[in-house]
């Protein structure tokens, strides 16, 4: 799902906060290696399906110990095969001129079990190649296929999501454009999540997390981004997006939806939504704590992990199916449809 520019919905010109870099570099960030041969990757005919991959597959584009195969999604993501081990990876390709901006978030961020990071980085004369461990689908697809997730399962997954976001915020990364698709499963049982695509994150150099960028996914954008304010809190905007994600996981639909963008943005600005019946009191409380119109009233990411819903046993509660039958309200299939639809101390900050 692509993010959509929202500058037209505000009276303020869109200004992206420039990335600034300092010496706070993570020693565990993969070392950037240079490669000599660099053919342009492209589609290759008659490639076998992923399940049939083996080291004997005819090469498409050779890059050091890797073979780049066909595109996976978008214009810069490819399947890749590590020839010595036969292990399949995902390779993201960028212009070499963008290397500093692409790698800066990973250099800043210490390793975390719920944040994906490149296993290897190769730099050619024109292109940058980042290799990631293969994943097993994204959370958006799971929610759509099941039209919502029972509370116990949702709590286990959302705890991982909040942990990843809290880790990023602690180390000065504002994620922006948070959505279910950015959380992917690292195991085939689909119980462990990692946050991917840190390339677009803003790297902050101090406590001020003000942003001017009006670029976001319509379904997940916070009301303050749609307002005429010249800037907004990046961390609070990320928390709003987490609230939208949690609501969608439990209800199987977005809290704010309309086929007309102007009407959708109006609903988001008003900040009124109807919680589905059947949710536990603590789940309803957490959603309301995240989807507050006033950014300063929302939980901070670390505070989410302290909320009772993530600490109690909600195994006896599951969202009703009756609220998920309206086809115009379910999570849409594919990025095009989704884009169109689109009191304890320390809890607050």
From Swiss-Prot:
Organ and tissue specificity: Detected only in the lung. Not detected in the heart, brain, spleen, liver, skeletal muscle, kidney and testis.
Database matches in InterPro entries: Kinase-like_dom_sf, Prot_kinase_dom, Tribbles/Ser_Thr_kinase_40
Localisation per UniProt entry: Nucleus
Ranges of Acidic residues composition bias in the record: 336-349
Induction comment: Expression induced during programmed cell death evoked in neuronal cells by NGF-depletion.
GO MF annotation list: ATP binding; enzyme binding; mitogen-activated protein kinase kinase binding; protein kinase binding; protein serine/threonine kinase inhibitor activity; transcription corepressor activity; ubiquitin ligase activator activity; ubiquitin protein ligase binding
Gene3D superfamilies membership: Phosphorylase Kinase, domain 1, Transferase(Phosphotransferase) domain 1
Domain of life: Eukaryota
Gene Ontology CC terms, in alphabetical order: nucleoplasm; nucleus
Domain Protein kinase as annotated: residue spans: 63-310
Chief localisation class: nucleus
UniProt note: domains: The protein kinase domain is predicted to be catalytically inactive.
Subunit structure: Interacts with AKT1, AKT2, MAP2K1 and MAP2K7. Interacts with ATF4. Interacts with DDIT3/CHOP and inhibits its interaction with EP300/P300. Interacts with APOBEC3C. Interacts (via N-terminus) with APOBEC3A. Interacts with RELA.
Protein name per UniProt: Tribbles homolog 3
Gene this chain is encoded by: Trib3
């Amino acid at each position: 799902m692509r993010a959509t520019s929202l500058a037209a919905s505000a009276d303020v010109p869109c200004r992206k906060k420039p990335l600034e870099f300092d010496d706070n570099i993570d020693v565990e960030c993969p070392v950037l290696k240079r490669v000599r041969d660099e053919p342009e990757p492209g589609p290759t005919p008659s490639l076998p399906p992923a399940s049939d991959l083996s080291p004997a597959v005819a090469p498409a584009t050779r890059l050091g110990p890797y073979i780049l195969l066909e595109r996976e999604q978008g214009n810069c993501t490819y399947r890749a095969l590590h020839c010595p081990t036969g292990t399949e990876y995902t390779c993201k390709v960028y212009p070499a001129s963008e290397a500093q901006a692409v790698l800066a978030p990973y250099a800043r961020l210490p390793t975390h079990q719920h944040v994906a990071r490149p296993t290897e980085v190769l730099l050619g004369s024109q292109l940058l190649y980042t290799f990631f461990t293969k994943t097993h689908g994204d959370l958006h697809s799971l929610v759509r296929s099941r039209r919502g997730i029972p509370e116990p399962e949702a709590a286990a997954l959302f705890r991982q999501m909040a942990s990843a976001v809290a880790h990023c915020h602690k180390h000065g990364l504002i994620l922006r454009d948070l959505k279910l698709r950015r959380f992917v499963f690292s195991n085939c049982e689909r119980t462990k999540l990692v946050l991917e695509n840190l390339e677009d994150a803003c790297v902050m150099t101090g406590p001020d997390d003000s942003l001017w960028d009006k670029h976001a996914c319509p379904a997940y954008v916070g009301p303050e981004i749609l307002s005429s304010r010249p800037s907004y809190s990046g961390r609070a905007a990320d928390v709003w997006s987490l609230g939208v994600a949690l609501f969608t996981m439990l209800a199987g639909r977005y809290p704010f939806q309309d086929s007309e963008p102007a009407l959708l943005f109006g609903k988001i600005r008003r900040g009124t939504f109807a919680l589905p019946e059947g949710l536990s009191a603590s789940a309803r409380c957490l959603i309301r704590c995240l989807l507050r119109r006033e950014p300063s009233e929302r939980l901070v990411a670390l505070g989410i992990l302290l909320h009772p819903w993530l600490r109690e046993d909600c195994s006896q509660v599951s969202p009703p199916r009756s609220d998920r039958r309206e086809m115009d309200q379910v999570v849409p299939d594919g990025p095009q449809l989704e884009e169109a639809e689109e009191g304890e101390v320390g809890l607050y900050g």
